[in-house]
């Protein structure tokens, strides 16, 4: 079935809405749903009625936790929107959304401008090369300053942020904006919830300013594309001769090439500027065609290939989110990069191996759904029937098996023990933990070998608190949790080797395995790699996989204090076997023993998570705050002044940050705030290492 005209690839936009917490992301999305006809009533976040925040925890806390997907139509385009969380504990949601988007709207608060979390999200978008347009929201707030917000984008994000609108008034007097492309003013009607506005001449007191801003915009566009001599000549000789279409085409080109970030303004809460933002998304954001070909690895030829966004090509898709729906069970969200997906199709999962059949296809609107028979290139679909697929898996047709670039997930930094309140809940708890860890790759579940306790680990206290809450609500499991603990790691500092034999003889058939390993430190953050360099069959092929499994198990429990060993390169170099006594289990046990024997010789050390901490404090309390951070083994990496406050940037070990919010409140009489996010892992000082090992 051919796709409808509105859904042609050139008319498709896959966008995310990203920002700092409280910049108004969900409110903006609610307005988009309202004006595009998706919802007939505006849901307010502070009333707990926002459509996109559909989890009970989100409605209570007024924050967005999972990236809800929804589809809207505006003018001639189909827009898939992913609303992403701004809280740092849910960075994975932002990361996985950006991986499958073609463009993003970055929201900034007109009062605070660029905040620490905005920098994190911007960096993530840089990593995936996602084009962005900026929307300065909350122009009706006390202290709103559009031009200061643009300045902070340029200074802190190094963004090429150029206004394409000029606000008319600010704070309580914010009336609308001037469109610098059309050189017309939009004045909004409050009585129609902003659905109507008057297009008028530019107010006389703003005319000169707008002419100057337009000239700056055109000059910037001319320098972006020096090959377009016609455009440059018109800008230099007669800028008024440029048509709207020519200017829009130049803006679009700059956005699609990721060289230009147009800045719009408005107040989503007061219903001003949202329709103009939608117009900008359609006019300037890239379609899957503009994003071009996607790199993939062809498993038949073992070569890199380029996938063309085309419905007639073989199917290639990426699973980017798994959710458990109370009515339909497991939902797998996918982005289709090429081909057409029909209900009932069997897909090859090249990441995990094996085929699975899709029984139903759904188009999602926050937590409502619409059944569809097929989806096309560029679409974001929710599939039912995929039991094995997890986040980051490649799904394709067996005619052309390929692998798409995999997604990377940060290591958890905090852990706690969890146990069911009653024995009867043990199985339910195991199911709940399994289900939640499939949904969220940054949530890990392990068992402490010594105590038998179940340990959950995640990206922060709020992250684990919300998952604990979900167990109660969604899975009906009552569980007790221990105090939060730091998720330490171990690593090695020098190369080493081991020659290990595992021999067991107790009458009858014995057990025999012999494994020799060479291990050395890997690059920081690169993870573990285990490679078999066995030649000549000294260890038979069928025993290599169990040996690797044993080594991986050894890596997962470390040698100093039972923490994961990370950033270790392991080569299996030699070994031997016995025709009768060797078996898979013997080689698995021997692999684990050999790894530990080698690691003990390699001067192992404990690593601790270091947090990037940004404290905003009145100047009067700056000395106390810095002194306290130093006492916490923190390193001050910089500070800046912003609107009468000082922002202190520091790197502090997570173990020193428990209970920090209470102390900061008393240090600053409740006037300082802070945000923190995981930065990297670093060696702990030897004295602290000894204390950790004793515990």
Swiss-Prot record:
Disulfide bonds: none
GO molecular function: GTP binding; GTPase activity; translation elongation factor activity
Alphabetized InterPro entries for the sequence: EFG_II, EFG_III, EFG_III/V, EFG_IV, EFG_V, EFG_V-like, EFTu-like_2, G_TR_CS
Pfam families xref list: EFG_C, EFG_III, EFG_IV, GTP_EFTU, GTP_EFTU_D2
Taxonomy, superkingdom: Bacteria
Annotated PANTHER family: RIBOSOME-RELEASING FACTOR 2, MITOCHONDRIAL, TRANSLATION ELONGATION FACTOR G-RELATED
Family: Belongs to the TRAFAC class translation factor GTPase superfamily. Classic translation factor GTPase family. EF-G/EF-2 subfamily.
Gene3D superfamilies cross-referenced by the UniProt entry: 3.30.230.10, 3.30.70.240, Elongation Factor G (Translational Gtpase), domain 3, P-loop containing nucleotide triphosphate hydrolases, Translation factors
Amino acids binding GTP: 19-26, 83-87, 137-140
Localization per Swiss-Prot or TrEMBL: Cytoplasm
Annotated source species: Protochlamydia amoebophila (strain UWE25)
Role summary: Catalyzes the GTP-dependent ribosomal translocation step during translation elongation. During this step, the ribosome changes from the pre-translocational (PRE) to the post-translocational (POST) state as the newly formed A-site-bound peptidyl-tRNA and P-site-bound deacylated tRNA move to the P and E sites, respectively. Catalyzes the coordinated movement of the two tRNA molecules, the mRNA and conformational changes in the ribosome.
Record's protein name: Elongation factor G
Domain (tr-type G): residue spans on this chain: 10-289
Entry GO CC: cytoplasm
UniProt keyword list: Cytoplasm, Elongation factor, GTP-binding, Nucleotide-binding, Protein biosynthesis
Entry's Gene Ontology BP terms: ribosome disassembly
């Amino acid at each position: 079935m051919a796709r409808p005209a509105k859904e042609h690839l050139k008319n498709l936009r896959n966008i995310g809405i990203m920002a700092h917490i409280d910049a108004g992301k969900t409110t903006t999305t609610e307005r988009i749903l309202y004006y595009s006809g998706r919802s007939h009533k505006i849901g307010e976040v502070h009333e707990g009625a926002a459509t996109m925040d559909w989890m009970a925890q989100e409605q209570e806390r007024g924050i967005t936790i999972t990236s809800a997907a929804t589809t809207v139509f505006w003018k001639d385009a189909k827009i898939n929107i992913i609303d992403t969380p701004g809280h740092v504990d849910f960075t994975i949601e932002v990361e996985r959304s950006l991986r499958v988007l073609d463009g993003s709207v970055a929201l900034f608060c007109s009062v605070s401008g660029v905040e620490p979390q905005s920098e994190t999200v911007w960096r993530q978008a840089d990593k995936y090369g996602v084009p962005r347009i900026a929307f300065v929201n909350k122009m009706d707030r006390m202290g709103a300053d559009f031009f200061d917000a643009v300045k902070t984008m340029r200074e802190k994000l190094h963004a090429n942020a150029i206004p394409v609108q000029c606000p008319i008034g600010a704070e309580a007097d914010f009336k609308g904006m001037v469109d610098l492309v059309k050189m017309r003013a939009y004045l909004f009607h409050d009585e129609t919830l902003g659905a109507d506005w008057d297009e008028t001449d530019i107010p006389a007191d703003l005319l000169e300013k707008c002419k100057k801003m337009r000239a700056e915009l055109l000059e910037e566009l001319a320098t972006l594309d020096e090959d377009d001599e016609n455009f440059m000549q018109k800008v230099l000789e007669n800028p008024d001769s440029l048509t709207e279409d020519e200017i829009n085409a130049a803006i679009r080109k700059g956005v699609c090439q990721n060289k230009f970030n147009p800045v719009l303004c408005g107040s989503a809460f007061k219903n001003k500027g949202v329709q103009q933002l939608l117009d900008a998304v359609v006019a300037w954001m890239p379609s899957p065609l503009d994003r071009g070909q996607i790199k993939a690895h062809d498993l038949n030829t073992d070569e890199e290939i380029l996938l063309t966004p085309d419905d007639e090509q073989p199917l290639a898709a990426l699973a980017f989110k798994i959710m458990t729906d109370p009515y339909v069970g497991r939902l797998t969200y996918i982005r289709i990069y090429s081909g057409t997906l029909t209900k009932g199709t069997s897909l090859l999962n090249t990441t995990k191996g094996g085929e699975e059949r899709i029984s139903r296809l759904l188009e999602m609107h926050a937590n409502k759904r619409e059944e569809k028979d097929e989806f096309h290139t560029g679409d974001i679909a929710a599939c039912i029937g995929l039991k094995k697929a997890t986040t980051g898996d490649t799904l394709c047709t067996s005619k052309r098996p390929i692998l798409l670039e995999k997604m990377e997930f940060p290591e958890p930094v905090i852990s706690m023990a969890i146990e069911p309140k009653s024995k009867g809940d043990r199985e339910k708890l195991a199911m709940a933990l399994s289900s939640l860890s499939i949904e969220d790759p940054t949530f890990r579940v392990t068992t402490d070998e010594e105590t038998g306790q179940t340990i959950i680990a995640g990206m922060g206290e709020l992250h684990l608190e919300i998952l604990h809450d979900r167990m109660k609500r969604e899975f009906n499991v009552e569980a007790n949790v221990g105090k939060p603990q730091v998720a330490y790691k171990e690593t090695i500092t020098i190369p080493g080797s081991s020659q290990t034999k595992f021999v067991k003889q107790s009458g009858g058939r014995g057990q025999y395995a012999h494994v020799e390993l060479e291990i050395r430190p890997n690059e920081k953050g690169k993870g573990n790699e285990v490679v078999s360099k066995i030649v000549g069959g000294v260890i038979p092929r069928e025993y290599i996989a169990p040996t690797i499994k044993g080594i991986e198990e050894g890596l997962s429990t470390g040698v100093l204090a039972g923490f994961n060993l990370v950033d270790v390169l392991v080569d299996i170099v030699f070994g031997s076997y016995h025709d009768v006594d060797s078996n898979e289990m013997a080689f698995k046990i021997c692999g684990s023993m050999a790894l530990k024997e080698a690691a003990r010789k390699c001067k192992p050390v404990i690593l601790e998570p270091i947090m990037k901490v940004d404290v905003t404090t009145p100047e009067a309390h700056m000395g106390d705050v810095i002194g306290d951070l130093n006492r916490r083994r923190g390193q001050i990496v910089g500070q800046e002044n912003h609107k009468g406050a000082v922002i202190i940037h520091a790197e502090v070990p997570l173990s020193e940050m428990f209970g920090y919010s209470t102390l900061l409140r008393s240090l600053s009489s409740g006037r300082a705030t802070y945000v923190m996010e995981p930065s990297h892992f670093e060696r702990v000082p030897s004295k602290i290492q000894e204390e950790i090992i004793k515990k």
